[in-house]
Amino acid sequence: MNRLLIPLFALLLLVGCSASSGGAGNGTQTLTVAATAIPHAEILKQVKPLLAKEGIDLQVRVFADYVQPNVQVVEKGVDLNYFETKPYLDAFNRERGTHLVVITGVHIEPFGAYSRKYKSIDQLPDGASVTIPNDPSNNSRALLLLAKQGLITLKDPTNEMSTLKDITANPKHLQFRQLEAAMLPRTLDEVDLALINTNYALAAGLNPTKDALLIEDKNSPYVNYLVGRPDNQNDPRVQKLAKALNSPEIKAFIEQKYHGAVLPAF
């Protein structure tokens, strides 16, 4: 009886150790990345065959929100994520007491303001209803875009963490509503203006370069990063993914696929 159990236990232990080491069988190693659907998961799909040549099976888990991709990396449900800017990551780390780190910058998504009621920002009426993201980083990003257009004045127009409390002048008496970023495209039929992250704008069928009444210029500092943990940032698999994301093939894909709505950051 014991002679049978001991080899069986050893076999189970060996299988368990193999599963936790990231192996996918046949010498292939897995790497799992959390991402939002557009453009992040689309870009990762293009990277997949590049990593396959390196013996890495890239697996992508798509999320619809901006919280779970970070939570999953912290809790080691996934290895990395690819969806966020540095200001957003810094705010998340500060609020949650986490220590996620940037691996490499990949692309920029110029942030835009959209309307289904008006064709020009000059048509925006007094007391217009405006929806903006409720997370600190993108909330500030929306306000900075409005301030640059002169629709509001901020206490410090260079502060990347400005809030509604920092508005010192609001000549058009804009009425703000703060919502989760993913919800903003759904508000277009009921509000005068919605400030929307490009990934959600693209998913809603909007073309930022044609449909946005206001849009950040190409010098936007809001690069989207591949993000990991201190314990895996130097993992060879992670470094190979970072190199692939900054490859000429991916740069060409971004330029040809998104026509300026998404820009390479390398």
Model-flagged regions — what are they?
Residues 18-21:
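Bacterial signal peptide processing site
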Residues 13-16:
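C-terminal motif of bacterial Sec signal peptides marking the signal peptidase cleavage site
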